[in-house]
A protein has these predicted regions:
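Histidine-anchored nucleotide/phosphate-binding helix
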Residues: 2-18
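Active-site gating/interface segments in enzymes
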Residues: 59-60, 66-71, 142-188
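Hydrophobic alpha-helical positions that pack around
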Residues: 21-134, 139-142, 151-152
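Ferredoxin-type iron-sulfur electron-transfer modules in oxidoreductases and energy-metabolism complexes
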Residues: 170-183, 193, 197-233, 237-254
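Short glycine/threonine-rich loop-to-helix capping motif typified by GTGT followed
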Residues: 32-41, 158-165, 236
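Short, solvent-exposed helix-helix connector turns and helix-capping sites enriched
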Residues: 3-4, 32, 212-213
Length: 254
């Protein structure tokens, strides 16, 4: 957003034209003032695109939360942004669209953010070719590495260290697998309920998932889960709440 604001703006215009949309908003959290300023400067002549600075909070980037924050329209249970007349795309997609149209280059590389238990000088953004194995990227893995594809909240553990960079690989979180808290029984504290942005009962849905009670999980609203990970993060017993919910969610889709 700081390096290529003009290209991103052109990419947004191309997507608007393809979707037949007359207005677009680029939402930026308030902890990224330089990005917001760069984009605003690039959009001076584009009156149909604006930059909206939003309060930094998690999970602000979820499409349902983002649409409500920007437009005030609330997306109902089981619905998509299109149901309220909105389409949500990320900045990387806008840049890739510009690149494809302006230069003819398909999506053969992308920016990947690397962070976690690695040397502080190696925690940065890399341009990686699609298909590059994780363990061949220019950073040093810890002795017992665990690679999370994505961030620490919503990311998924890579099955193999040589798994490839894909078009949706926005970042990698490198962890030391030797550091792992002991999982304890649920104490019914309600922390996960308070943390859930969708108003669900994660402790209950995860129990249904663990016991393979798919119908009960569906009735409890598992399909509305954003998979933001706030439940697992808030759990004092270190229960893998989100993992169980993901299993139930996948089974209920069948």
């Amino acid at each position: 957003m700081c390096a290529y604001p003009g290209r991103i703006a052109e990419g947004v215009e191309l997507m608007m034209k393809a979707a037949g949309i007359g207005k677009a908003v680029i939402a930026v959290e308030d902890n990224k003032p330089e990005a917001a300023a760069s984009l605003s400067a690039a959009l001076d002549s584009a009156h149909d695109i604006s930059v909206r600075v939003l309060k930094t909070k998690y999970p602000q980037g979820g499409e349902k939360q983002l649409v409500e924050a920007v437009t005030g329209r609330r997306i109902g249970s089981g619905k998509l942004p299109a149901s309220v007349g909105a389409v949500v795309h990320n900045i990387a997609t806008a840049f890739a669209v510009w690149q494809a149209v302006a230069t003819g280059q398909p999506l053969i590389e992308r920016v990947v953010t690397i962070t976690g238990d690695i040397n502080s000088q190696e925690r940065k953004n890399y341009i990686a070719a699609i298909g590059t194995p994780f363990n061949e990227m220019p950073f040093t893995l810890p002795a017992s590495p665990r690679i999370i594809v994505g961030g620490p909240m919503m990311g998924r553990a890579a099955v193999r260290l040589d798994a490839p960079v894909m078009k949706g690989t926005s970042g990698l979180t490198i962890l030391d697998a030797g550091v792992k808290p002991k999982v304890r029984a649920c104490v019914r504290c309600g922390a996960c309920v308070d943390a859930c942005p969708m108003g669900l009962e994660p402790y209950l849905i995860s129990t249904y998932g663990r016991l393979r009670m798919w119908d009960d999980a569906s009735a409890a609203g598992v399909s509305d889960c954003l998979e933001c990970g706030a439940c697992s993060y808030s759990c004092p017993s270190y229960r893998p709440i989100l993992d169980y919910i993901r299993v139930a969610k996948q089974r209920c889709k069948r």
